[in-house]
Amino acid sequence: ASGCGLTEEMIGRLHNAGCTCYGDGWFPEKLIKDIHSVVLGAKVKQDNPELLRAKELGMLIQSIPEFIFQRTRSKTRVVVAGSRGKKTIISMMVCALRRQKLAFDYALTSKVDSLPNRVHLSYEARIALIEGDEHITSALDKRFQLEFYRPHIAILTNLSWSTETDHATPEAYLSTYQSFSVS
């Protein structure tokens, strides 16, 4: 794992999760042909040295939503999306799943107090709880993150467009959610 602006705490959490992390910054020399793929964060720019190296080596480059979908493809995907209230609904779902003693994976953008981290992907769980996001996927792919998840169960909280979103108009914002709801 690599990135610019990583704190010592983040690096420690990555190490504790079993990830190799060389520290704060970009390390294109660490990308070698033995690495299967590169997962591209939404804020990575097109001229990023690791991205350029991955392209040079012909590596599979995936956005975070693509990676999550591929890792949860055979699971029942429950996606909670919307402008506000996702964390509360996810917290209630975590409580219900645990009470029923159901194993589940999760990929969240918000910190949920009852979970040790924001991502847990396993081979055993048959359910994946995903926090959906309506933002642009990456510098290479201008589709919206919600377009990738293909939920079996979709839960929408309130929808509230603002000028700070990646959508130029309220109509474009609602269109993203309409596409998501029929995926």
Language model region names:
Residues 19-24:
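Conserved SAM-binding strand-loop segment of SAM-dependent methyltransferases
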Residues 12-16, 29-33, 42-183:
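Phosphate-binding loop of NTP-binding sites
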